[in-house]
Curated annotation (Swiss-Prot):
The glycine cleavage system is composed of four proteins: P, T, L and H. This is Glycine dehydrogenase (decarboxylating). The keyword Oxidoreductase applies. Transmembrane segments: none annotated. It catalyses: N(6)-[(R)-lipoyl]-L-lysyl-[glycine-cleavage complex H protein] + glycine + H(+) = N(6)-[(R)-S(8)-aminomethyldihydrolipoyl]-L-lysyl-[glycine-cleavage complex H protein] + CO2. GO terms for cellular component: cytosol; glycine cleavage complex. It holds the Pfam family GDC-P. The gene is gcvP. Belongs to the GcvP family.
Amino acid sequence: MTTPTEFHFTDYQPYDFANRRHIGPSPSEMAEMLKVVGYKSLDALIDATVPSSIRQKVPLTWGAALTEREALDRLRETANKNQVLTSLIGQGYYGTITPPVIQRNILENPAWYTAYTPYQPEISQGRLEALLNYQTMVCDLTGLDVANASLLDEATAAAEAMAMCQRVAKSKATAFFVDANCHPQTIALIETRAAPLGWKVIIGNPFTDLDPVDVFGAIFQYPGTHGHVSDFTGLISRLHQTGAIAAVAADLLALTLLKSPGEMGADIAIGTSQRFGVPVGYGGPHAAYMSVKDAHKRSMPGRLVGVSVDARGNRAYRLSLQTREQHIRREKATSNICTAQVLLAVMASMYGVFHGPQGIKAIAQQTHQKAVLMAKGLEKLGYTIEPETFFDTITVEVGHMQGVILRSAVAEGVNLRKVGATKIGMSLDERTRPATLEAVWRAFGGNFSISDFEPDYRLPKDLLRTSQYMTHPIFHMNRAESEMTRYIRRLSDRDLALDRSMIPLGSCTMKLNATAEMLPITWPEFSDIHPFVPANQALGYKEMIDDLSEKLCSVTGYDAFSMQPNSGAQGEYAGLLTIRNYHLANGGTHRDVCLIPTSAHGTNPASAQMVGMKVVPVKVRDNGDIDIDDFRLKAEQYAENLSCCMITYPSTHGVFEETVREICEITHKHGGQVYLDGANMNAMVGLARPGDIGSDVSHLNLHKTFCIPHGGGGPGMGPIGVKAHLAPFLPGHPTTDGREGAVSAAPFGSPSILPISWSYCLMMGGEGLTQATKVAILNANYIAERLKGAYDVLYKSETGRVAHECIIDTRPLADSCGVTVDDVAKRLIDCGFHAPTMSWPVAGTLMIEPTESETKAEIDRFCDAMLAIREEARDIEEGRADKNNNPLKNAPHTVEDLVGEWDRPYSREKGCFPPGAFRIDKYWSPVNRIDNVYGDRNLICTCPPMEAYAEAAE
């Protein structure tokens, strides 16, 4: 008889520690993997991989790791320090109701939030359709021809609009006009963007201060930040007469009732879709939009979803006109944008699908009527309301009573907007209740009931909308929640995300987004805080941001962090601006040269161009390392004007370079600063710190290293860390410190997703984060070893190791049997995998990054699939398979292939069920291989007519 083990309570350890869940391989599996790699211990592998010259001297420690429950309790305690009042502050941020069917089935659904940017369109058809709906909705409401699939926020979109105006204008002027009625954060970002490019920004009343001859473009706010609704038709016509371009920042909800920018003649419309069901979240994330006239579509920044056909001629969606983007055109790109806000754009599009045009118009009418009722009550109290006609925002002159009324409103549970020294503004919205109006009246000294007033309209009659919008059937088919739920499910079933399989994209770090980390983002204490509330109402946010910043400083060796950049590309831009402003403050106005290796990610040169720097490329050696001799030569050659260098570490080739310290020393010797791209930080956390190596500034991709999900192409966060001498030059914001240099609309970027990264740090602890880095390196080296022999691993260190990712060479297959890297990628779809990163940083190769979250079983399944693909290529090489009609060339295979007529020289079994593919719950690509050329030559970027859907169903 077995004696039970004696249990002592002091031995008890909770089982819900995150590192037990987050790290994929078990200790026994790690031992097996280490044996394959050739090391007896994980530490021995790390010692052989990470150069001792850069190793972190002090372990990463900041207290014990918390369990999931303890971390959630800590988050709840912190969230409760935020005060959730009703905010009528407006200024581009409004209360909205997220339909529960959208919250549960999209925002909280890993099938949507764990997907990657849809570069592989065959396995992204659901998301692409949702984004096409978004583009269609935006085009209809703005009255323009083509819309993109989102930008980062409204203010950033305005800055992008200015840059686009300059690109396409026939005018040779160097100034840009900004309507003084634009939101303050919009004006601030435009000024930030214009300064390094040498453009003058003129701010004023467009009806009295704008001379079209003086500008290459202008932007107008519609309605204005203080409520004015103006007709810009005449001004736009005058701008066109001088070759200038007109942009309008428009409220989508208002456009259901008001004449569209397109009908006024605008070339560009921008704005935010936040009030279409996306919580304010202390400033973000939200999806901005941009729409343009057809003539300007190739100059528009951001992703653009278009319609094409697959190999069977069936309709299929894809990203169109990608040659405009930074990964192709580099410093000549339209923008440095990499991804934007796909998840939030999907939510906004579904808001439109669910409510339809009648529902959205009804919400707009109710919002306007609330504003009119508010105005009537204040007028009864003797106050004068500005403007006379408005949509949702009014401004009240209160004189010396401003402070008293604002405080009284807060006591009533309402935040109002301080306007100048003597006025108060308020913006009504979908969530405004009758009790809120009565509370505001009390704050002004009145004691009215909403029943005391009759609603009416105060919209300008000559600007009432008469044109139709959202007429496509998709906006009329899903009013019943049962149908809406099924529609969302049908779309998600067409996509491949982390909830189905590993996504081994190199330089993308598709790691686990733990459910416990995601839970707090929908708590009202985080999601319902306006970004411009008084500081004492956001003490929980301050505590979280301060602690996360401190932890990131500990991880990186930097002295200060700014959370403002709301993407990695925006982080690069902010970091380079910080360097530029540092040089300007120290007399270095001439320092404008940026050294960038030719292997760098396309955002690097694109970002450098945006801050007015001249990009000087540096050679890369055959082994993938920066050519130190060429770097030294260029640094000496441009020493007088050297501003900085931009490097990635580990390198973009997936190797820890031994010369990184020397590169930093050379740069500093010649007066430059070092920008170290933090995209590969998942290989460094706990092992090496950029600030110790010699770097001056980095951005971190919190949506990579620190677990914020990619959302199918956003949201992201790209906070920047700097050494102490650069800290005074970090981005400011007009609503907080009043300093210049804002790079995002909100002071802290997209803070409502920061609980994800903070809880990840709390639950992993310093020791857990370090272990995660080590396992990420183990997993990458294990894959390199397993694929060795079948494929060449292009870049390794002197010890034969890779960092957290590896590049395998598929070019020999193209030479031996005509199999391209695209064929390999599409065949992986048949196996149930998203392809690794294709043709970057080396054309014709695959960059593989498994992350620490993947189990040995999943990694082995991927390796088995890759090895099977090599054997299929060998069949072609040795004549056992037709060179043009084989599983690789015909991939991906669909259900239609399986059940249709089969005229191929290989079996259905071989085509549809390759090694690595699950049989019972296999993922089937919804379309065959998509024709990219057709899609660009026959560009359609709005929903096809209903007949196309009917034809597809036949």
